[in-house]
């Protein structure tokens, strides 16, 4: 069974990497090249090495019925494999990125190889921090954020997202509030959703989603909803039978491959653009961002975490005039700055 699972995952990884390379060349670069996707042709040996580095980590994937294995395969599918491939296509000088490719591959191997307890450990010791402390803390954080952004808070439509972001960027000059926003989105929201699911308490789950809603209404960050929804997804998956967990990776690869080949077979401009948009917004985001960040930080000063406002308020080391790091990097990468 273990050997069959290994072969299935290896075969799926090879298919995924090869199909993603085709999708990059035929969809991502032609349609979204103006956004920053680049395409440099290298030798067949470079392509072979890239494929090996992208596929090899899957040999260490366990596919056990635990959340960490579920998360790790998503990291591989949406971040590591596309990033390794895009480093080849997005770099004119392959020698400048090959070590980074190796680092990505080894990091994914380490992630897959971490040993976890297969059985749940029941601890009799009470939590060191009383649960009421978390409730008091989240109330303080929520009130601070709402008091800061209340005049601009709203559910922004797709057309209004960037308008709201510009408005709120002008409001918050206090690094503490920005720090609270990070805690709200990345700690309190998933904490309460996960706790509510485990305890089967819908009120706690709703509190977690309320934290995400406040973040979105304040900053228009669509990713605010990703974490609580991902918690729901992980919770539902780990409750499934073992064979459903094992088939997760091959199923995603099959879906992606069918999507690509059906799109390639349909001679329709609208379908071509729609498919390109879907691939770019799901599987292709890391393939866009990774070469950009590598290129910029190979030639420009590092931030040393000074892009975090509370750290920059102490060190003053932030090297860009644009306060939002992503915008600063992308302006430098695309030549707008």
Describe the residue ranges of each PLM region.
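Loop-centered beta-sheet repeat module
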Residues: 219-282
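Small-residue-enriched transmembrane helix-hairpin modules in multi-pass membrane proteins
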Residues: 24-39, 161-175, 179, 256-337
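Helix-loop-helix junctions and helix-breaking kinks within/between transmembrane helices
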Residues: 86-99, 210-235
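Short, well-structured alpha-helical interface segments that form or flank functional binding sites
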Residues: 188, 224, 335-336
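Membrane-anchoring hydrophobic segments
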Residues: 1-193, 197-202, 206, 239-245, ...
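Cytoplasmic juxtamembrane regions at transmembrane-helix boundaries
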Residues: 83-89, 199-220, 313-324
